[in-house]
Amino acid sequence: MVVYLAFGLLYSVTTPLFEASDELWHYPFIKRLADGDGLPVQTPDQIGPWRQEGSQPPLYYALGALLTRWVDTSDMEVLRWINPHADIGVLTRDRNVNMVIHTERERWPFSGAALAVYLVRWMSVGLGAVTVLAAWLTARELAPGNRWLPLAAGAITAFNPMFLFVTASVNNDALVIALCAVCLWLMVRYVRGEPRPWHWALLGGLLGLASLSKASALGMLALAAATGAVVGWRTRHTPAGGWRALLVAGVGIAVPLVTIGGWWYYRNWLLYRDPLGLNAFVAIVGPRHPVPTLRQLLGEWQGFVMSYWAFFGGVNVAAPRWVYWALSLLGGAGLLGMALHVWRLVRARERD
């Protein structure tokens, strides 16, 4: 954990301001909330400096605003001097990769908007530490008594170059990943244990917070439902088991989830007639024409792999090719090991 924090802080102070993925758009959302201007209403004819990120659920931005509201950030537009010639999202020979033009305002000692950005970056590093801890706890739950597997799970999570890069920047992914990782750990515990009603309420509350961090967290609801189903099936021969356990799980999760996150999706419905707000998001960022086919998406597999492992800057600073090969081989070995482990478990159960 100490090594992760050291690397995370190093990434946070060496990555130039606004040169980390969509940090250029994430931070203005935080500044708007810190200035007391409230949540933006997204329209394609009035695009704010937060662009499409203003359509994102607001929890991460609200936390960043609370952390930095005391900082005078009136110099943000001077600091955020956009480079009109930057090659964003593509690899080019001219290497014009800087999304902004950098000035002396970024130098130590930090002040103004630069200080605010670094404070939020350090908050993200802390959230990354929560993710690493949750990975360690999940592996320990899955393999009790195994000293090395939890350590390996934490290390693989912590030292993924892209994970370090994202969790050392202003990015709501840092919060949603941390919350989902904790939820995953709890679900593994519940499958193996005997969860009580308050356990389900805790899971529902965390899922509600995750849904207020990024809409993609709603995908965790399928895992939560599966967890409740497994617990119900495993306890079906007990008085409080079976359908009763499934009902307790469903209500326990749904009530805090809707209470915490429901208002955001209702607001989206009122404003955009889309609970996820995706139509407003796409109207600003622009739709893809033509709609890609499955074959085209498979043809972009290399880009997906690169962006998972190490694709820095504005998705325009790549690592050497051998890095992707090495990391992909490591990931492939992990998948092979998982398949082998499952096969051994099945064989052991057949023998029993």
Where would I find each of the regions flagged by the language model?
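Transmembrane signal-anchor helices characteristic of membrane glycosylation enzymes that use polyprenol
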Residues: M1-L24, A34-W50, W70-R80, P84-H85, ...
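Start-transfer (signal-anchor) and selected internal transmembrane alpha helices
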Residues: M1-L9, L119, L127, V132, ...
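Short helix- or helix-capping micro-motifs
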Residues: Y4, A153-A158, L207, S211
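Interfacial juxtamembrane loops and adjacent helix segments
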Residues: R32-R121, G286-R288, V315-A319
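Membrane-interface transmembrane helices that cradle and orient dolichyl/undecaprenyl
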Residues: R140-P144, C183-H199, A210, G232-R234
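Perimembrane helix-loop-helix junctions
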Residues: L186, R192, M220-V255
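Membrane-interface alpha helices of multi-pass inner-membrane proteins
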Residues: H199-A215, M220-L221
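Membrane-lumen/periplasm interface segments of multi-pass, membrane-embedded glycan/lipid transferases
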Residues: W269-A348
